[in-house]
Amino acid sequence: TCEVLGEVTGDGRFVVHDEKDDTTPVDLDLAKVLGGIPQKTFTDERRKQKLYPLALPRCETKKEAVADALYRVLQNIAVGSKRFLVNKVDRSVTGLIAQQQCCGPLHLPVSDVAVVAQSHFGLTGAATAIGEQPIKMLIDPEAGARMAVAEALTNIMCARISALQDIKCSANWMWAPKLPGEGSAMYDAACAMRDLMVLLGIAVDGGKDSLS
């Protein structure tokens, strides 16, 4: 289930009504705020992808084949070490960090979840996890979006969360929608992610985009 905060009426006004005391603290004419800004229209068309089976180059020896395969796998940033990003920031600000990115005696950046305490003496806090599926997005944008949500949820399960409905997501879109077919692919991915989140009872309450 999802909370309904309001409805779009199309009358050009932003109205907040308080049912408790039957008052209307906000009744704003959007034309005075937006100043007649023309609505943008984006046009794109879906393009069927031409997908080919994975083909690895032939190597003369098994040693070369293993080395080549390892090199290709480690080029994927989701597989390689995040140390280049983790080591350059302070990971103990406020003194409330209960779980940071690095784990164990070797201080390896392999943690699935980050945990910040609410106080120095309490047993509650906030947990953060990430889900990213760029490779799957290239093959199937809708499936990739659902898998990104699933990855974030399986990562955050390492922390004892209060309830599934308490999870709020920040959706960050790194896409090139100006390329032919990419705008519609991003739209399909967003719809797939929305449908899954509605089904699970979680929601997006923020985010950013990089859509150059």
Model regions and ranges:
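Glycine/proline-enriched, intrinsically flexible loops and inter-domain linkers
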Residues: T1-S212
